[in-house]
């Protein structure tokens, strides 16, 4: 029986980078007889333009029916002034919540070929391989009540809510421990337990879960210190588990240790490892349509999809090896270019990965 993959290119550079990822996926599909069937739909600003909402009900139904979703990026200045509840980003939040995608895996890996592209000295980041496990459907991004009210003195005051239940914390903690168990057996839980009640519960529950993983070394770190340590000595970390907002911020910080956020894929998984896969970067509307965006994060998201949702290790490894070979050839998009390398565009980079994969 064929497996259904829903393709959601999104906005900005999304369609450009997705076109290259789809080429790689289609080749892998043929080369390894994966049995995938691909279908396409719209999300974000593209969905607003077509349906008037950032995620149409029929698109959500197709996502539920699919075995995995591959997404580009959403958002752009075109939709910045519309009502907040129907902005492109709300479509992304909704599909995550409705599909139960509570576990976000964001690797930060420095390819040896890109050591000079990192913002830190090579000796600080050489060999970097961190996995950030971010809780994705709870916390302040979804908490209620939220809003803006007028105080007695006429001044406006805005407020948000940061709730976490024991079950929400427990399930993401288990993802963190499971990932640490198959990696370096070190897990750092990041919170703000010296200030936030939600973080105090977070730390308590993580400690409880740790009893089931005696082979994994658990440490705790306040988020402000973690942000500093990621720059000071990033290789002390193996797996980091943290809440929605902290994970959002720390994973973007970690991305720049690798040279470019354009290199980093991500996976968002439900309890059964059904997932949505997307690059960590945004829609980059400032370069959309210019053919210069880096498609490698989206291509590597395909690899993550094969690995985590379908357990297709051989095909996943091959795509990652193809990307590494292209970097060995000195091909670079502008965001990772350095002297002595060859600058290429989006399509050229995608074609190079396809050629490398075909020749493996």
Curated annotation (Swiss-Prot):
Disulfide bonds: none annotated. Its cofactor is Mg(2+); Mn(2+). Substrate binds at residues 96, 106, 134, 224. Its main location: cytoplasm. The keyword Ubl conjugation does not apply. One of its GO terms (molecular function) is NAD binding. InterPro entries: IsoCit/isopropylmalate_DH_CS, IsoPropMal-DH-like_dom, Isopropylmalate_DH. It catalyses: (2R,3S)-3-isopropylmalate + NAD(+) = 4-methyl-2-oxopentanoate + CO2 + NADH. One of its GO terms (cellular component) is cytosol. It is found in: Cytoplasm. Mg(2+) binds at residues 224, 248, 252. Binds 1 Mg(2+) or Mn(2+) ion per subunit. Pathway: Amino-acid biosynthesis; L-leucine biosynthesis; L-leucine from 3-methyl-2-oxobutanoate: step 3/4. Signal peptide: none annotated. SMART domains: Iso_dh (SM01329). Its EC number is 1.1.1.85. One of its GO terms (biological process) is L-leucine biosynthetic process. The keyword Oxidoreductase applies. HAMAP family: LeuB_type1. Belongs to the isocitrate and isopropylmalate dehydrogenases family. LeuB type 1 subfamily. Homodimer. This is 3-isopropylmalate dehydrogenase. The gene is leuB.
């Amino acid at each position: 029986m064929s497996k259904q993959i829903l393709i959601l290119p999104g906005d900005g550079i999304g369609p450009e980078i997705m076109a290259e990822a789809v080429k790689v996926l289609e080749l892998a599909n043929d080369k390894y007889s994966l049995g995938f069937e691909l279908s396409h739909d719209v999300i974000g600003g593209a969905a607003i333009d077509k349906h008037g909402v950032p995620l149409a009900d029929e698109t959500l139904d197709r996502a539920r029916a699919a075995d995995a979703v591959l997404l580009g990026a959403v958002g752009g200045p075109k939709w910045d002034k519309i009502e907040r509840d129907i902005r492109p980003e709300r479509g992304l939040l909704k599909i995550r919540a409705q599909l139960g995608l509570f576990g976000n895996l964001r690797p930060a890996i420095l390819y040896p070929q890109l050591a000079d592209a990192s913002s830190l000295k090579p000796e600080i980041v050489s060999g970097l391989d961190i996995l950030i496990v971010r809780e994705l459907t709870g916390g302040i991004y979804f908490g209620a009540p939220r809003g803006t009210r007028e105080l007695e003195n006429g001044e406006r005051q805005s407020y948000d809510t940061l709730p976490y239940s024991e079950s929400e914390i427990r399930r993401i903690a288990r993802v963190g421990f499971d990932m640490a168990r198959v990696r370096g057996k070190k897990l750092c839980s990041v919170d703000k337990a010296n200030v936030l009640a939600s973080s105090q519960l977070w730390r308590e529950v993580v400690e409880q879960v740790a009893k089931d993983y005696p082979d994994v070394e658990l440490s705790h770190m306040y988020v402000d210190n973690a942000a500093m340590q990621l720059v000071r000595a990033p290789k002390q970390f193996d797996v980091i588990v943290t809440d929605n907002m902290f994970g959002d911020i720390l994973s973007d910080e970690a991305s720049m240790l690798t040279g470019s956020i354009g290199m980093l894929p991500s996976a968002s998984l439900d309890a059964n490892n059904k997932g949505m896969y997307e690059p960590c970067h945004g829609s980059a509307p400032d370069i959309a349509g210019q053919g210069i965006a880096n498609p490698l994060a989206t291509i590597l998201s395909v690899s993550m999809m094969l690995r985590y949702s379908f357990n297709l290790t051989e095909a996943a490894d091959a795509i990652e090896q193809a990307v590494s070979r292209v970097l060995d050839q000195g091909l670079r998009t502008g965001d990772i270019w350095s002297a002595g390398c060859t600058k290429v565009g989006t399509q050229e980079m995608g074609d190079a990965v396809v050629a490398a994969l075909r020749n493996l």
